Regions:
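Active-site substrate-binding loop specific to GH73 endo-beta-N-acetylglucosaminidase modules
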Residues: 99-104, 108-124, 131, 135-142, ...
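Flexible, low-complexity segments enriched for small/polar residues
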Residues: 2-3, 8-22, 50, 54, ...
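Surface-exposed patches in mature extracellular/periplasmic domains of secreted proteins
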Residues: 19-26, 170, 194, 241, ...
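Alpha-helix C-capping/helix-to-loop hinge sites
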Residues: 14-17, 145-146, 164, 168, ...
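N-terminal accessory alpha/beta regions
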Residues: 20-176, 181-183
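Hydrophobic residues in alpha-helical segments
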Residues: 24-27, 36-37, 147, 182, ...
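Hydrophobic/aromatic residues in well-formed alpha-helices
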Residues: 7, 23, 32-33, 241, ...
């Protein structure tokens, strides 16, 4: 494998693919890795308009447009059967009654101190639309970061942690806070990341720790922290789960979505957890977990499967896990060691990773400098392909690997370039998910149609091609876009697609044909 091939492999695994200008820069893989680490050192939270949804008492409205531009006067609520004369204030209905008391178990779902059950169907519909819009905006803002940010390694690490610490809640503010906690510590020390995520209201709600009290312990949070986040099955006992649950009693959150330790709900008695006895707190449990050698091995194995190969190699994992633990669980140090290893560039680890839907979409946009006019169809493609950001299927996250591919998703994957760049006709009615963030969509609302308005600038690719004769351009572009050698019969198909076209159109046809090959699904 030559240096150029190693560079492309690095950019695909440590980010979302190389741009033509990255290839033209001619950096060695070692220098490119240093640049990736440098560019990803700074934490920048995901912020922007429309990323949150607040529905304070009396501002639920039936017209989606009016909620964004016309607040209701006097904190009242309007309904469709109460039309107001032109220029006159809308006729109000009775304001919603405040919640009598907070009893735990949920974060107010976009309606602070209001009972969701008391909303009218119209009000509930408007709430669902507001929540859905906020999550859609969060997803598109993050996809933009993946496609355009120079902090490629941080974005890829955030995607990894997004699946590792899988969480699904209805509250955009809570989901965004959790996301930014992962973003902040994505390349820092894992103990800091673990504590921050564990004390996020979204995670505490998702894993039921708001109901974990000394009189009635709830084991769900403690069990998942060990099974999915730190140790893996077989490295703790049921007694450890029960004792850890006692240590986490009292961990919750307040109305403002802030972590709150409720001392009166905490079990302050002695506990024995993983061989350690004492008046252990939740923080003590998390710290003690990371003293176990199994924790480093478990975490490094998950990192290896995501960034290197779905089949772990113990000869690679054991020294990485040892160094990871010795470094105090320094994530940036782990990733530098992994991407610097000679075995990372072995043929068995190149072009063997099936791109997730998000990697596929972000990769097309990044490698070709694609500009998108309308990102809404891309959200539908995420879901149709099986990966909607902020909506993992369960606490275990997305299974990945070959699970990304079935007959229907493969068809959409292969047609996606034509849909994006030729506005080809393709409509798919998405299945209704009982756990939808905003449920009860109509079939029309669940139908994805073309219209992203994807613009494919040719100048960077023309510079990459330089003086390459037109007949050889498909092969050269295949070396840039594909991580595995193109088969002769596929190269012939690509060449035929570009025949009898003027140069710009021939280049565009070549690109669409290459992106439509099965080989492009691999990184």
């Amino acid at each position: 494998m030559n240096s150029a091939q190693q560079l492309q492999h690095l950019y695909w695994r440590a980010g979302f693919g190389p741009r033509p200008q990255d290839v033209a820069a001619g950096l060695s893989p070692r220098k490119a890795l240093r640049q990736l680490l440098h560019d990803s050192a700074r934490y920048e939270p995901l912020v922007g308009p429309g990323l949150n949804y607040t529905d304070p008492q009396g501002t639920v409205m039936t017209d989606p447009a009016s909620t964004k531009t016309n607040p209701v006067p006097n904190g009242m609520v309007t309904t469709p059967d109460q039309p107001a004369p032109p220029g006159a204030p809308a006729a109000p209905v009775a304001p919603l009654r405040p919640r009598a008391a907070f009893k735990g178990g949920t974060i107010a779902a976009g309606v602070p101190r209001l009972r969701r059950a008391e909303l009218t169907p119209q009000q509930r519909k408007m709430q669902n639309e507001g929540i859905r819009d906020a999550f859609n905006n969060m997803s598109t803002a993050w996809m933009d970061r993946m496609a355009t940010s120079s902090a490629q390694l941080r974005e890829k690490m955030v995607l990894f942690w997004h699946g590792h610490f899988a969480c699904r809640v209805r509250q955009p503010a809570a989901a965004l806070s959790l996301h930014n906690a992962m973003r902040q510590h994505a390349l820092g020390k894992f103990p800091d990341l673990l504590l921050a995520v564990s004390q996020e209201p979204a995670m505490l709600q998702f894993l039921n720790n708001q109901q974990n009290r000394k009189e009635h312990p709830n084991e769900n949070f403690a069990r998942e922290v060990m099974e999915l986040f730190t140790l893996g099955r077989g490295n703790y006992t049921e007694t450890d789960v029960k004792e850890a649950a006692r240590a986490f009693t009292g961990w919750g959150y307040d109305y403002q979505g802030r972590f709150k330790f409720r001392e009166k709900e905490h079990d302050a008695g002695p506990k024995t957890f993983l061989g350690k006895t004492g008046n252990l707190t939740g923080e003590d449990v998390l710290t003690h977990i990371l003293t176990q050698p199994a924790a480093a091995t478990f975490l490094v194995t998950k990192v290896y499967r995501f960034f290197v190969n779905d089949v772990p190699n113990p000869a690679h994992i054991e020294p990485l896990a040892r160094d990871f633990r010795r470094s105090g669980y320094d994530i940036a140090d782990l990733m530098e060691r992994l991407f610097s290893a000679d075995w990372f560039y072995e043929p068995a680890n190149v072009g063997t990773h099936i791109k997730s839907p998000v990697e596929l979409l972000a990769g097309i946009r990044r490698t070709l400098n694609v500009k998108i006019d309308n990102e809404q169809p891309l959200l539908g493609y995420q879901r149709a392909l099986g990966q909607t950001l902020f909506q993992p299927p369960n606490v275990a996250g997305w299974p990945g690997g070959r699970n990304w591919i079935d007959s229907s998703s493969l068809l959409l994957r292969l047609q996606l370039p034509a849909i994006l760049f030729k506005n080809a006709e393709f409509a798919v009615a998405l299945k209704q998910d009982e756990n939808d963030i905003a449920p009860n969509l109509t079939k029309a609302e669940r139908t994805v149609r073309p219209g992203a308005g994807a613009h494919l600038p040719l100048a960077p690719l023309q510079q990459l091609l330089g003086a390459t004769p037109v007949p050889q351009q498909p092969e050269k572009l295949s070396q840039f876009l594909l991580q595995t050698p193109i088969r002769p019969e596929n190269l012939q198909l690509v060449q035929q697609a570009a025949q009898q076209k003027e140069p710009a159109e021939a280049l565009r046809a070549t690109l669409v044909s290459l992106l439509s090959l099965p080989e492009y699904q691999l990184a």
